[in-house]
Amino acid sequence: MADSGSEPRSLLLVHAHPDDESIDNGATMARYAAAGVNVTLVTCTLGEEGDVVVPELAHLGAAYEDRLADHRAGELDAAMAALGVTDHRILNEQNRYRDSGMMGSPSNDHPRSFWRADVEEAARSLAHIIRELRPQVLVTYGPDGGYGHPDHIQAHRVAMRAAQLAGQAGQADASQNARLPHAVAKIYWNCHPRSAARFSTKALRAEEQTPFLLDESAISVTDDSFATCVIDASDHLAAKSAALSAHRTQMTVQGAFFALSNNVGRLISGEEYYHLAYCRPDLAVDEPEDHAAPDLESDLFAGL
C-alpha cells in the first residue's frame, strides 16, 4: 500500500483544532500509518477557546489563565503517538492562528483568530507543505465545516485554496523556489451519514448505564448518498479510542462511547465516511448508465 507510481503514498489531513482529527479520522489515520503510508496532520489552531471538561484543569481556559494551547499541544502529541502518526504540524507555526471560538462569539474578533486570517496567506503556507510532502490525497471539511464552526469553515477554504496554489506554476515565494508544483489527485471532505448517526444513537440507547445524553437532532449529519467512501478500520479501534482519550480536556471517553462538553454520547466507530469532492480528471469514474448509486470506495487511494 505504500507506493503509488514513482512516489510513496502520502495522505494529508487538515483540521481546525486538536481532537478534530481523532474524532473524524482517527481510525483512518491509524490504518494508513500502519500500512506504511506517509500520514501528515496539519492543525490550524491549538484550540485555545475549547471548553475544558476536567474541573481541575478549568483554570487553563481562555476565560481564566488562557494557557490551554500548550496543554492541548501535548494532548495532540499523545493522540498522534496512539495513532502511529509521526508527522504533525501547526499551520504557520511561527506566527500561529488562534482558535476563533463558536460563530458569533467575541473571540471571532481576536486579532489572531483563524476566522480573521487572510485566506491567501494561510493557503500559501499550506501550499508550501503540500509541495514538500506531495500527497496524493487531502482530507478536510466541507464548505460548512461540518457544523458551522468558523475555524472549520476557514480550514476548508484554506485547504481547498492551498491545493489550487500548490499545483500552479509561479505560485512559489522565495522560500519555495526549489519546490516543484504538485497536483493533489483526490480531495475528500469528512461526512457523517444519517444512518451512522442513527446507529450510534441506537447503540447508546441500549446501554443500561451511561453518563451520556442522547441527541436525535445531530446537526452535522448528511444524507447517506453524500458519502462516497467508507474506511473500515475496525482493527484500529483501540488506537482511535486511545487517541480520543488523550484529548482529556475536551472529552470524556467511557467504554465504546465519547462525549464532548455538551455530554452528548457518540459511538467510537471504526468506520469513517468521506465525500469525494475532487478527483483528477483521468481518475474520475463515470456514472452508471442506469444512474444507480455507485458502490462506496473502501480506500482513499482507489484509482491511484
Curated annotation (Swiss-Prot):
Positions that bind Zn(2+): H17, D20, H152
Alphabetized UniProt keyword annotations: Hydrolase, Metal-binding, Zinc
MF terms in GO: N-acetylglucosaminylinositol deacetylase activity; zinc ion binding
Cofactor note: Binds 1 zinc ion per subunit.
Pfam families: PIG-L
Cofactors that this protein relies on: Zn(2+)
Reaction catalysis annotation: 1D-myo-inositol 2-acetamido-2-deoxy-alpha-D-glucopyranoside + H2O = 1D-myo-inositol 2-amino-2-deoxy-alpha-D-glucopyranoside + acetate
InterPro entries in the cross-refs: GlcNAc_PI_deacetylase-related, LmbE-like_dom_sf, Mycothiol_biosynthesis_MshB
Gene3D superfamilies (alphabetical): LmbE-like
GO biological process: mycothiol biosynthetic process
Major enzyme class: hydrolase
EC number, as in UniProt: 3.5.1.103
Task performed by this protein: Catalyzes the deacetylation of 1D-myo-inositol 2-acetamido-2-deoxy-alpha-D-glucopyranoside (GlcNAc-Ins) in the mycothiol biosynthesis pathway.
Similarity comment: Belongs to the MshB deacetylase family.
Cited PANTHER family: 1D-MYO-INOSITOL 2-ACETAMIDO-2-DEOXY-ALPHA-D-GLUCOPYRANOSIDE DEACETYLASE, N-ACETYLGLUCOSAMINYL-PHOSPHATIDYLINOSITOL DE-N-ACETYLASE-RELATED
Official protein name in the record: 1D-myo-inositol 2-acetamido-2-deoxy-alpha-D-glucopyranoside deacetylase 2
Species the sequence originates in: Catenulispora acidiphila (strain DSM 44928 / JCM 14897 / NBRC 102108 / NRRL B-24433 / ID139908)
Name of the gene: mshB2
